[in-house]
């Protein structure tokens, strides 16, 4: 059987209501509370359904019987009645109440009776007053809006609540106001400007001076905004703008701070409201956060985020958003605030991109820049969130119409460049692609093209603070703009013929190349790629018919030259090809200098070290150039073309490039010339290419007598000091234009030696000396700047001795070439095998190349100037990136870089610089340098800046080399036998010395050392990873050890004329002809450096034949004597190998002294510091565990040692007096410093609390005097202090003010109307007040109205108000008549007496005057 629970609940309620009526009728007050609670629960369960009561009965019972109990004197009955009625209003509909018969009578009681009682309850601070007001207003509902009498009665109650000084009453008044807003919104009254202005009055004017009141006020105001909904834009000026100013400051009154700056609770509520107003798109996390905070949700997207509304009101919205960003970033944000920061920045970004309001975009970028430049470095979070949003969503920016687009692009560009240090490069690049998208910046007409040109000029403006990273981002913008320019010029080609546009675009094309060349040595990566080169080529081709094209091509040639010399650019060949292509289209022979520019640039390319790929591309461009030219053009340029082709072949051979490209290249050029009718140029070209296979064999027997040369020949000889020794007959005319190569008259080659002398052009390992008559003129200008220094001769010698010494040194150069070259090739093959398995990284990793070491310098004792003999050693280079040696270009004198050898070769410490003949004084030059620092520096720089091997041989004319140096790379590993055809006496001595030296060197461990080095690219980011393997010169290690090893010169026999040379050499045990070898040293610590290195020993090198022997002595620079046991404190850090272990060793020693001093000082000051810590930590309640030095920890990246103090001194000091403690504190720290420390680390409340705990009265007096003095000088401070006192102690503050001032002073500051109303109201309930007021009426009549008519009218008004009876009227008339008679009698008597006295006695006049003066 189904049970109807609703009917049962209704019947239960009926029973309870009938019982309640009986209790109320019987007046059993002790049961009222239980009865009302039971009634409320029954009403809730039944919903007042199926109760068998009519609607009228229910309304009459609840509003007639229960509602009056809310005003009962018993507070408990009040509370129960309020709760029960609130439950009944849920079940009882308002329409039912208003349709009841008894409603008009109940409504009259509400207005006339209950409002007065509610006011009394409010004055009595009864918290139920606002609950009852709320219930009555909800019951009144729509009737409240129909008559102004009703609403005014209820509004007066709340208005006085807003003015109440008690914060609780004011907060309750705001709760009442929320109910009123709800009723207005329910009946669509908020659309009325009058109604809205009424609701905003307390919100805009009432002050919120407490956290509780401000929170409730903010909630009520936000509820009003949520009720406005889509009407929000119409009421922005009156409602929204004031709300933003109320929360975050600013606004029409330009408030410095808002509610969110003062109260944490208000901040938690204000920031979500701000984000909701900025809602460009709906956000579920924001909705969830609003529900958690019990805030009403605003419709999403926000009604304010439309283009029309935003254009009008973006300024106050942006000001509020910036203030909110600062609040969210100034402290460590909670999880909710981090979410709000992300949402606020995202909405800002969406508004910038979608709404396309140009002034807002510019202002927003400017404000974000200001936040980014803040001192607290909190702006990084904002810009990271901004660019993350752009990059993650690939936002598309709506184009701003008109000229404002230029301002927007400029603002974005500044923001991007300012943010590069905070935002990762990848994110910033994607953001640039979105912001400067081609379809958003491209030009569709001349005005837009002009605007785009203006932005291009802005982009090219140089900034002093700009670095290479900023240029990289600018270059990305350059690409976007270039694409837009290309698209426009493709459809409007005539624009390029306008002079201004052509000049701008020419500058635009040169800018990236010029800027990149200016950053040489400071850039860590290459910025150009294939897409850039394609764009650049398109723009170059677009301006083919532009005016001033020749000037542009000339400037482009100079720019390409600077770029080539500044740093190795992998894609230089692409740029060069575009330049040559443009030059061909313009006309290579129209202007004479143009083809010379091309060939001059090619000569520069061949002279500069470059990769094989770049060289092949440039040679291919040269071939294409030749193929494109016609016969008449080739005839014009042929004289300049020949040396260029020769230089290209020499460069190819010098770099020892592999592959068949060169042969194919030759065939292509020859095919072009073979097709021409004129065969003269083809024949010359054939001879030129055949000259490449010319090999010259120079015998070791070679004589020169400088004394037979004329002065002119000596000058020419000096000028050609760097040309290889290919000339026998030096007595021939040196003034002729050409020098004929020499061929020996007779060369006897034994059959056993034919293998050594068979040299072919196809041998890749051979060194080719290619000197022809046509190449001589090309080489000479390059070599002319090499200056050979003039050195002092140690003594006069005969010509024979000079020749013997020169021959002996030439022989010493060839000690160990065979085995060393074999090891070099082996090392190269191993490196090539390592580099081969990585083909995927071909654009980044280059193939192994060879690098020449520091040139080895030979010297002779000839009277003429010296020539250098360079013996190149193959070097294997492992390229790590496309940018090699980024630091070298900026250094005037490059030093050998640290090397790292990956393959497991036994480690050997060996440093062998070349032999340089000098005087017997310590050398001040670098190892491997000649007397000319500029030339040597240039040679070293050329060797280290580019991974290429120079194949040029430079021979000394006075010191002829043998055949081993002609082709030493393919020499056999066996010991060479003396050649039989050398018959001179000097040559026989050389052969004898060579045999003996080779016998001695075959057993030496240094003979098999390889001269190859692995020059590794060391970038700053990877320097610490490989810091353990560093090459350190031995002389620098000697400085580290702090020891002194002096050496004495070798005493040569007096019978021998010996040359003694002195030079600092790290390891003289290696071959003198070999450059500095690789060494590997692991520095464990400073004390582990051994002192028995071979570099610290002397070596005597001499040949066994006395006439040609030379004694050499190697002296280290003298240092002051130090003890090896004492650690060296003053180290030159630039001479110390900066390994991780070395830094740790230095840090440990420095830290050791500091720790010892700190411990010694701490032991003396333990008690003082313990007491100080106890006094400082007393407010936090923590025990003093550390002394003052614990906070001053040693600033070290390693293990920091905290010096802790034992607890015994702390306990001992706790019993000392306060005076003693204060004295010890002053001994530890200066009072000023202590005060600064307290101000910096302690809040003001803690310091003041200490003073008040010690002496409350004295501290309070001093604080009051200080505030009083400050208030006199600062009006704002005075206002704040007085407001605080009046808010927290309103009654006492007012009582004291009244007591301290006269009543007249107090009354002068009151409104007379208010005082009069108060006195009249008081007289109604106080008899004494009423009597006093009536007693003042006669005086007012005397001194008030001047005319009798006014007085009479006032008296008549009084009589009418009194409504006297007949008897009272008669008595009043009798009194008036009697008063009239008395007045007439007194007047006549006074007049008669006066007249008689005046006539009878003349002296009465003086007496009367005296009486009058006394009265006065």
UniProtKB/Swiss-Prot annotation:
Interacts with Pp1-87b. Interacts with SuUR (via SNF2-like region). It comes from the Eukaryota. Regulates the timing of initiation of DNA replication. Functions in copy number control by promoting the underreplication of DNA, which is found in many late replicating euchromatic regions of salivary gland polytene chromosomes. Promotes underreplication by localizing to active DNA replication forks in a partially SuUR-dependent manner, and inhibiting replication fork progression. Might also work as an adapter to recruit Pp1-87B to multiple sites on the chromosome and may function with Pp1-87B to mediate underreplication. It comes from Drosophila melanogaster (Fruit fly). The gene is Rif1. Residues 1029-1050 have a biased composition (Polar residues). Residues 928-945 have a biased composition (Low complexity). Keywords: Cell cycle, Chromosome, Nucleus, Telomere. The keyword Isomerase does not apply. Phosphorylated, probably by Cdk1; phosphorylation regulates dissociation from heterochromatin. Disruption phenotype: Embryos have a reduced hatch rate and develop into adults with reduced survival. During mid-blastula transition in embryos, S phase 14 is significantly shorter. In larval salivary glands, loss of DNA underreplication resulting in abnormally enlarged chromocenters. RNAi-mediated knockdown results in lethality. Escaper flies only live for a few days and are infertile. Females show increased necrotic spots in the abdominal segments. RNAi-mediated knockdown in the imaginal disks does not affect viability. Changing residue 1093 to A: Probable loss of Cdk1-mediated regulation leads to lack of dissociation from chromatin and block of replication resulting in anaphase chromosome bridging during mid-blastula transition in embryos; in the eye imaginal disk, results in complete lethality with pupae developing into headless nearly adult flies. Expressed in nurse cells and follicle cells in the adult female (at protein level). Detected in adult at extremely low levels. It is found in: Nucleus; Chromosome; Chromosome, Telomere. Changing residue 1002 to A: Probable loss of Cdk1-mediated regulation leads to lack of dissociation from chromatin and block of replication resulting in anaphase chromosome bridging during mid-blastula transition in embryos; in the eye imaginal disk, results in complete lethality with pupae developing into headless nearly adult flies. SUPFAM superfamilies: ARM repeat (SSF48371). Residues 789-858, 886-984, 1021-1054, 1166-1186 are annotated as: Disordered. This is Telomere-associated protein RIF1. One of its GO terms (cellular component) is chromocenter.
